[in-house]
């Protein structure tokens, strides 16, 4: 993971699930989970894990491996309870207003990685292959996100939009 800062203001956690080999319509027995941890400013993926389960221990490892944040925002999944530092957890079970950034990153993951697209015929054959694809995506996403963040800090005018040309 690329981490440029020591501490972040707000970090969001969420998970998405998908399948290995094929989509089982009767019972999703080979679900895999992609757990992501994203900072709001600058928008970076601070940690992720790809696994067959989404246990509290797995979530705790992602949190421990990243820099500490002022507050942590999550959705209604019970696995987040008790793993985040006391007094720093915003647990919103009713809506996604506190986890909009990580939901957007998960949408980007589904958009840019064909094996995570909802109506796709592409499926990862191995967990390691999906983990490697997400790792490459995270590296490029963080690099582009930091370039965009620094560009916006130096160019305050709204007439000067950030583009891929500025990144290259």
Question: For the regions a protein language model found, what residue spans apply to each?
Answer:
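Residue-level recognition of single "structural anchor" positions
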Residues: 1-168
């Amino acid at each position: 993971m690329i981490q440029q800062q020591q501490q972040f203001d707000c970090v969001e956690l969420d998970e998405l699930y998908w399948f290995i080999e094929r989509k089982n319509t009767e019972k999703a027995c080979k679900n895999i989970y992609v757990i992501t941890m994203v900072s709001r400013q600058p928008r970076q993926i601070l940690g992720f894990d790809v696994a067959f389960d989404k246990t509290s221990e797995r979530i705790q490892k992602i949190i421990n491996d990243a820099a500490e944040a002022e507050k942590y925002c999550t959705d209604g999944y019970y696995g987040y309870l008790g793993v985040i530092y006391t007094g720093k957890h915003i647990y919103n079970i009713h809506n996604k207003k506190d986890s909009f950034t990580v939901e957007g990153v998960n949408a980007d993951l589904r958009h840019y990685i064909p094996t995570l697209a909802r109506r796709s015929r592409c499926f990862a054959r191995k967990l390691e292959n999906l983990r490697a694809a997400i790792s490459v995506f995270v590296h490029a996403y963080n690099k582009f996100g930091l370039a965009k963040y620094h560009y916006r800090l130096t160019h305050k005018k709204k007439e000067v939009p950030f583009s891929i040309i500025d990144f290259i």
